[in-house]
């Protein structure tokens, strides 16, 4: 009887857990702007921080086996345009060498919103961060709520959210 109860309980718990949404790769490529970033080590994403970047474009290479990411970094107020290629590991998890080793996962994508979860290892510490991107220059209240939910699920503090679009004065 105990075994039947435990089996039933296990089945209910498994059923109640949210199934991760499937990523539609056709929605990944395009013109994207970073709206928000959050990190457990906020120093990495504050203005002048090494991981504060301003996305412009993401392209899929070979059916998203690699991602070409075009973005700006600011160096003493000067916008530097860079393009880096991230190589797919599994699912929608990619590895990119930039200010350390970065494991980047596309965790949500819709018509107007894309969210990445990044773990950056700089040789000393792993920083967990999320990046909330939009096709425009803002999130709807529902998109912001979704972004905050994804932060919570990944252990990234919502109080560390930085509004990057406010400081994005780099060329389109």
From Swiss-Prot:
Subcellular location, record wording: Secreted
Disulfide feature: 60-64, 79-170
GO MF annotation list: odorant binding; small molecule binding
Tissues in which the UniProt entry reports expression: Found exclusively in skin. Produced in sweat glands and transported to the skin surface.
UniProt-listed Pfam families: Lipocalin
A Gene Ontology term for the protein's cellular component: extracellular space
Coiled coil regions in record: none
List of residues that carry Pyrrolidone carboxylic acid: 17
Keyword vocabulary terms for this entry: Allergen, Disulfide bond, Pyrrolidone carboxylic acid, Secreted, Signal, Transport
InterPro entries found in the cross-reference section: Calycin, Lipocalin, Lipocln_cytosolic_FA-bd_dom, OBP-like
Principal location class: secreted
The protein, known as: Allergen Bos d 2
Family statement drawn from the similarity comment of this UniProt entry: Belongs to the calycin superfamily. Lipocalin family.
Signal peptide: 1-16
Function summary: Probable pheromone carrier.
Entry annotated with the keyword Signal: yes
């Amino acid at each position: 009887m105990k075994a039947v109860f435990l089996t039933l309980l296990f089945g209910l718990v498994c059923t109640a857990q949210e199934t991760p949404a499937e990523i539609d790769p056709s929605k990944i490529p395009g013109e994207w702007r970073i709206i928000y970033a959050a990190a457990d080590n906020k120093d990495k994403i504050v203005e002048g921080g090494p991981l504060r970047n301003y996305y412009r474009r993401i392209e899929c290479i070979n059916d998203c086996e690699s991602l070409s990411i075009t973005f700006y970094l600011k160096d003493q107020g000067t916008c530097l345009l860079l393009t880096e290629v991230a190589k797919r590991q599994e699912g929608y998890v990619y590895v990119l060498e930039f200010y350390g080793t970065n494991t980047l996962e596309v965790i949500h994508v819709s018509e107007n919103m894309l969210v990445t979860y990044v773990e950056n290892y700089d040789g000393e510490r792993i920083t967990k961060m999320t990046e909330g991107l939009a096709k425009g220059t803002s999130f709807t209240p529902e998109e912001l709520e979704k972004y905050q939910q994804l932060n919570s699920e990944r252990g990234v503090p919502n109080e560390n959210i930085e509004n990057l679009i406010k400081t994005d004065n780099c060329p389109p």
